[in-house]
Amino acid sequence: MSVSARIILSVLRAVKKAGLRKGRGTDVEAEIRKARACSRRHPYREPRGGKASYLTLHAGKYPCLLMKREKNRLTDKAILYLHGGGDRDVWKPEVSFARRYGERAGMDVFYPLYPPFTEASPEEAADLVFRVYRGIVKRYGAGAVSVIGGSYGGLLGLQLLSRINGHNAAGERDPVPMPALMILNSPFAYPKTEEKWALAERLEAEDPILPVGAFRYMLEMTRKAAPDTPDSLLYPADMDFRGAPETWVFYADEACSAVAEAIRQSYARDGVPDRLHMHIEPGMMHCCASAPCSGKADGILTGR
């Protein structure tokens, strides 16, 4: 990690320990209203600039940003990039990360703007991601598609694998194959057992990014906004990873890593333990592998 990144991390930890950074309030309905207001302040607008050729597609009522390597044609490989967020629509900050992945790997990038769970159910977001992925596979072929997800986008990536298996198990006439590769940076998900909840709370106390109580309030908000959300969209222990592709998971020693063992156990249960490559980096920060100063995820994607 660079010197500047270490300084930023130290400042964030100091601010949190000093009590200057507050977590969410205890009024769940009020927090949902705040999240919705935040989303309204950040409406989607197609990016401009010469760093990529941008095109806005639509998957139903939701936009999907296509970042093309070449203005007048598509390449023969693609990335499905799932940005973080969850309770609010914070699509813009990761556009540059997604574009950089495409530039370094020579791949087109599809960037769906999934709805936050305070606006639509997690099932609707998962269905959007599945439909976008299926469309990409029809154009490029599954062997040419990689999926990258960070934080809540990492949860969407895990959901996608489970959704593919559910679709195929239902005997649909158009089975959907798995992607060639999946890279998840600090994937967010919920602990299933009280032991893991306790671990998450201990890790939250030291986490420079997530406030104390983040997991509890996110789950409470989800249950309030979308009470019919199935466990298979919340807990890795209830997901189906049969036939999963090579999956690289990067965590810092952070609160999100409380579900690392659940992911590992689920891959083993579903017969693909050797396809999961998990790395927990002490002293790093949330989504560290996707940061420009790291390059770890870039190296996996490009084979360097």
Question: What is the predicted function of each stretch?
Answer:
Residues 3-44, 77, 137-142, 159-304:
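Alpha/beta hydrolase fold serine-hydrolase catalytic domain that processes acyl esters and thioesters
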Residues 31-71:
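N-terminal cap/lid segment of alpha/beta-hydrolase-fold proteins
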Residues 71-101:
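Short, surface-exposed "cap/lid" segments of acyl-processing enzymes
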Residues 78, 106-110:
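A fold-wide structural signal in alpha/beta-hydrolase
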Residues 86, 114-118, 189, 285:
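Alpha/beta-hydrolase active-site loop signature
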Residues 91, 110-144:
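Catalytic nucleophile-loop/oxyanion-hole region of alpha/beta-hydrolase
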Residues 147-149, 185:
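Short beta-strand immediately N-terminal to the catalytic nucleophile in serine-hydrolase-like folds
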Residues 149, 153, 157:
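Gly/Ala-rich beta-loop-alpha elbow adjacent to hydrolase catalytic centers
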